[in-house]
């Protein structure tokens, strides 16, 4: 598979190593686990090479022997979350199977509140992510859609679910300000269609109402992309 000229190789295509002549004190998996703990407790901004090294009881310079950059660390963290899926066998109802998978995606995004934004801004494919794609395609094995449509469906399932997760995390005060501005803007009379849509609405639908529509929205998107089986 061709790569971008000059781009650094994926961390999983680089040999796991420690300092030359020294036994490995930690594994990438151990370092990743510590980084996940920091992110889950304090947020992604708290994750730095220095902070993770401190949690391990060493200096940042020592950590660079195992993980070259913070971006590598973020990639390891993202892929590690894909190991949390519990793949269920195909039932013969591809759409129901994908909705079940989507609900697992939601649960993982809720557990790791930093993950949805990172998944959208910095998508990464590692060993666990590759296994997840294989499972997704297995659920669609009997579906006649071509592989391009199936990969688009995989991307949309993840992207829409990430957007739902971010919406659930949104500040209610910001939503209230947005609705207040809409009410102000509609008094101009220049948005008749929006006015008709929102007439009688006391407030914008709360995030939990949108969350309740998750399965229906995902079903419509996936059916639109893939078509009937």
Kindly label every feature range from the protein language model:
Residues 1-26, 192-204:
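N-terminal intrinsically disordered/low-complexity leader segments
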Residues 2-3, 176-229:
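A structured, mid-to-C-terminal "fold-capping" secondary-structure block
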Residues 30, 34, 38-71, 76:
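Helix-turn-helix
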Residues 30-37, 41, 72-87, 100-104, ...:
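Alpha-helical structural segments
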Residues 86-128, 157:
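Hydrophobic alpha-helical connector segments
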């Amino acid at each position: 598979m061709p790569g971008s000229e000059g781009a650094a190789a994926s961390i999983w295509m680089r040999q796991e190593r420690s300092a030359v002549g020294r036994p490995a004190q930690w594994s990438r998996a151990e370092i990743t686990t510590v980084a996940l703990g920091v992110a889950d407790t304090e947020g992604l901004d708290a994750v730095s090479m220095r902070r993770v090294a401190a949690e391990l009881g060493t200096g940042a310079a020592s950590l660079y022997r195992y993980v070259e950059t913070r971006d590598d660390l973020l990639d390891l963290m993202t892929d590690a979350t894909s190991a949390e899926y519990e793949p269920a066998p195909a039932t013969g109802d591809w759409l129901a199977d994908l909705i079940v998978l989507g609900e697992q995606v939601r649960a993982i995004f809720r557990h790791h509140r930093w993950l949805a934004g990172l998944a959208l801004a910095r998508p990464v494919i590692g060993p666990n992510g590759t296994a997840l794609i294989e499972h997704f395609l297995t659920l669609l094995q009997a579906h006649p859609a071509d592989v391009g449509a199936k990969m688009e469906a995989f991307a949309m399932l993840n992207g829409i679910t990430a957007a739902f997760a971010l919406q659930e995390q949104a500040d209610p005060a910001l939503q209230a300000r947005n609705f207040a501005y809409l009410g102000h803007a509609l008094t101009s009379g220049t948005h008749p269609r929006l006015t008709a849509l929102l007439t009688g609405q006391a407030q914008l639908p709360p995030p939990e109402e949108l969350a309740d529509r998750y399965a229906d929205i995902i079903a419509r998107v996936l059916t639109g992309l893939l078509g009937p089986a």
